[in-house]
Swiss-Prot record:
The keyword Transferase appears for this protein: no
Family: Belongs to the ABC transporter superfamily. Energy-coupling factor EcfA family.
Gene: ecfA2
Matches recorded under InterPro entries: AAA+_ATPase, ABC_transporter-like_ATP-bd, ABC_transporter-like_CS, ABC_transpr_CbiO/EcfA_su, ECF_ABC_transporter_ATP-bd, EcfA2, P-loop_NTPase
Enzyme nomenclature, EC number: 7.-.-.-
Source organism of the structure: Lacticaseibacillus paracasei (strain ATCC 334 / BCRC 17002 / CCUG 31169 / CIP 107868 / KCTC 3260 / NRRL B-441) (Lactobacillus paracasei)
Entry keyword set: ATP-binding, Cell membrane, Membrane, Nucleotide-binding, Translocase, Transport
Residue span, ABC transporter domain: 3-246
Protein name: Energy-coupling factor transporter ATP-binding protein EcfA2
């Protein structure tokens, strides 16, 4: 299911003295099966884009086409429930959305809200806890007795239980330690790789962009200023700096090594790419 923005603008509090632009004249396509990262400094419009992906916000002008559903400023909210099942949203600190007495009930709540029987919803809960790497015995526990990282996994399992076609992630690893962050990003990558899950990731972590995304949207001052692969986006460090963005840590390390005589072509963006180019130079004495 593609999501297409066609000259989309959104103004907060339109028609009032407090009106402010959220996004301006954005056009682009998030392809079915892609892993798209949306980056940009704070206030660039990332969150506004995100909220258009399942019509939490509707364009002030332009259209957002989600699958076969065209969203305009005039779209009636009553017709959006099926759409919101297709696009699952995982917000920052998703664990704050938990509220049920048990993990099983919390995960089953979403599917039941969309018409799935209690029996089938609980079966989905059983399946989803395994998918997010939690043991079966958490199902009967209170979500509030779990660790913060486990609570976040439960919240994500609740979104996945609705079996969305598109999974939208807003800084999903915020507040996690490096190990927890890596485990969670690997979980999303597995969903993408093994099930063809379309993923949209809003992040400040350039390492995650390099490691996982196949497409990148760069936002600045409400405008979509650049799209491309991670390699295309990270090819110009000066341009990144001008737009208050940086290189992945691996690329920064490669620059430091290049200053000491090592050669890299193309610029490595991930740890595996760096190792592939660095090991032969260390072993074979190919430094300049």
């Amino acid at each position: 299911m593609d999501i297409t923005f066609d000259h989309v603008s959104f103004t907060y509090q339109a028609g009032t003295p407090f009106a402010g632009d959220g996004i301006k004249d954005v056009s682009g396509v998030i392809r079915d099966g892609s892993y798209t990262a949306i980056i940009g400094h704070t206030g660039s419009g990332k969150s506004t884009i995100l909220q258009h992906l399942n019509a939490l916000l509707k364009p002030t002008s332009g259209t957002v086409t989600i699958g076969d559903k065209v969203i305009t400023n005039e779209t009636n909210n009553k017709n959006l429930k099926p759409l919101r099942q297709k696009v699952g949203m995982v917000f920052q600190f998703a664990e704050n959305q938990l509220f049920e007495q048990t993990v099983a009930k919390d995960i089953a709540f979403g599917p039941q809200n969309f018409g799935v029987s209690e029996k089938d919803a609980l079966a989905l809960a059983d399946k989803m806890v395994k998918m997010v790497g939690l043991p079966h015995d958490v199902l009967e526990k209170s979500p509030f007795d779990l660790s913060g990282g486990q609570m976040r996994r439960v919240a994500i399992a609740g979104v996945l239980a609705m079996q969305p076609e598109v999974l939208v992630l807003d800084e999903p690893t915020a507040g996690l330690d490096p190990s927890g962050r890596h485990e969670m990003m690997q979980m999303f990558e597995q969903l993408h790789r093994e099930q063809g899950q379309t993923i949209v990731l809003v992040t400040h972590q350039m390492d995650d962009v390099a490691d996982y995304a196949d497409t990148v949207w760069v936002m600045a001052e409400g405008k979509l200023i650049k799209t491309g692969t991670p390699r295309e986006i990270f090819a110009d460090p000066a341009w990144l700096k001008a737009n208050q963005l940086g290189l992945p840590k691996t690329a920064q390390l490669a620059q430091q090594l290049a200053a000491k005589g090592f050669h890299f072509d193309p610029q490595p963006l991930t740890e595996s790419e760096l190792a592939d180019q660095l090991v032969p130079q260390i072993g074979g004495g190919q430094r300049g």
